[in-house]
Swiss-Prot record:
Sites bearing 4-aspartylphosphate, chain numbering: D55
Family to which the UniProt record says this protein belongs: Belongs to the CheB family.
UniProt entry keywords in alphabetical sequence: Chemotaxis, Cytoplasm, Hydrolase, Phosphoprotein
GO biological process: chemotaxis
Record's protein name: Protein-glutamate methylesterase/protein-glutamine glutaminase
Top enzyme class: hydrolase
Organism taxonomic ancestry: Bacteria, Pseudomonadati, Pseudomonadota, Gammaproteobacteria, Alteromonadales
The species this protein was found in: Pseudoalteromonas translucida (strain TAC 125)
Active site: S209, H236, D333
Length: 391
């Protein structure tokens, strides 16, 4: 079944090019256009698309207001297009708060010049987001969260090889585990009454993608100022957006939230957001641990920042004293890094399917048998505070 799309933009050129690009994919069908936010609200009701692409800045009714009205009257997955400016980043975060599912930078040059990577990204986002609507109206698909699918691997992963190359002090490459049957995913009923494990932690690391901004805000705003450990945040997000996102979180949270910088010393009660377009790793030992933030030109690691890269670095720096959490997101970034953490004795949690915007990254963790618990989003902060002893 093709994903039915409503394209919303006040630029006729952008509407036409987005439509042409989407319809290159046989699994996507553009069923209509809207030229402003008011038009979008009306056509969302009349056409009932599976998903909507929408510009943030439009006449008559802006994108943020349109998102609010659509989500109130005809809830539909929405992908926002936003300019790569500080005001554009702030507006995009407002749109996500209003209910939009995800966003892409609005780059006319990529659209005009048929940038292959940009085209594939747009098509994949539209299909993944649109299918969330299709799954809601179709019969529920069975959850595989309690049925781990183990895929034995005899060779080092690309991540492990990359990590060993980047970290000059590494002397061995960790081999992926073949089975984690001793750490099954915990059911929700068990989670509600579960007490702290008593395990010792030094670091919390959280990785996410689609749906992550709202998920992170939900969790971090519930943490106390005296949270006992540093927190590393890896959110797939362009470089122009991470400063605004860190600033927004910092204004809402009791803990300090900042965009990570080269040489930052890791401190308890501070959350460090990986900068867009760069990787974030950990250098040093003990109290002298600092962050290494750098541009990665490797083609072997698709995401910048990458959850895998940071998780792998945490496994080396902290061994088993890490609580890693994988939240909503497309793809499987984080799985190989979580595998290395698991081998070091770390604890891995995954967000459950029902509360995810996109059940991709957490599903990869669960299916690989790496998650000791699968948690609904609204319970993550409660469990986290209990687990680290500040509940």
């Amino acid at each position: 079944m093709a994903v039915k799309v409503l394209v919303v933009d006040d630029s006729s050129f952008f509407r036409r090019r987005v439509s042409e690009i989407l319809e290159l994919d046989s699994e996507i069908e553009v069923i209509g256009f809207a030229v402003n936010g008011r038009d979008a609200v009306e056509k969302a009701a009349s056409l009932r698309p599976d998903m909507i692409t929408m510009d943030v800045e439009m006449p008559v009714l802006d994108g943020i207001s349109a998102v609010k009205e659509i989500m109130a009257s005809n809830p539909t997955p929405i992908l926002m297009f936003s300019s790569l400016t500080r005001s554009g980043a702030t507006a995009t975060l407002d749109a996500l708060d209003a209910g939009a599912m995800d966003f892409l930078p609005k780059k006319f040059e990529d659209i005009a010049r048929n940038n292959e990577d940009a085209i594939k990204l747009l098509q994949s986002k539209v299909k993944e987001i649109g299918r969330q609507r299709i799954r809601r109206v179709a019969s529920p698909r069975p959850s595989s969260i309690n049925k781990p699918l183990f895929t034995p691997t005899s060779a080092p992963s690309a991540l492990a090889a990359r990590f060993a190359q980047t970290n000059k002090t590494a002397t061995t490459v960790v081999q992926p585990e073949r089975s984690f049957n001793n750490s099954p995913v915990t059911s929700r009923s068990a989670i509600v009454t579960k007490r702290a494990s008593g395990k010792h932690y030094q670091l919390v690391a959280i990785g996410t993608s689609t749906g992550g901004p709202v998920a992170l805000q939900t969790i971090l705003t519930q943490l106390p100022a005296n949270f006992p450990h540093p927190i590393l945040l890896i959110q797939h997000m362009p470089a122009a957006f991470t400063p605004a996102f860190a600033a927004r979180l910092n204004s809402l949270c009791k803990i300090q939230v900042k965009e990570a910088q080269q040489g930052d010393r890791l401190q308890a009660g501070v959350a460090y957001l990986a900068p867009g377009g760069q990787q974030m790793m950990i250098d040093g030992r003990g109290a002298s641990r600092t962050l290494r933030v750098f541009e990665d030109n490797s083609e072997r690691i698709s995401y910048k920042p990458s959850v895998d890269v940071t998780f792998a670095s945490a496994a080396k720096a902290y061994q088993g004293d890490v609580l890693a959490i994988v939240l909503t997101g497309m793809g499987a970034d984080g799985r190989e890094g979580a595998r290395m953490l698991k081998q070091s004795g770390a604890t891995i949690w995954a967000q459950d399917e029902k509360s995810c915007v996109v059940y991709g990254m957490p599903q990869a963790i669960a299916n690989a048998g790496l998650a000791s618990e699968s948690l609904p989003l609204d319970e993550v902060a409660i469990r986290l505070k209990t687990e680290v002893g500040c509940g």
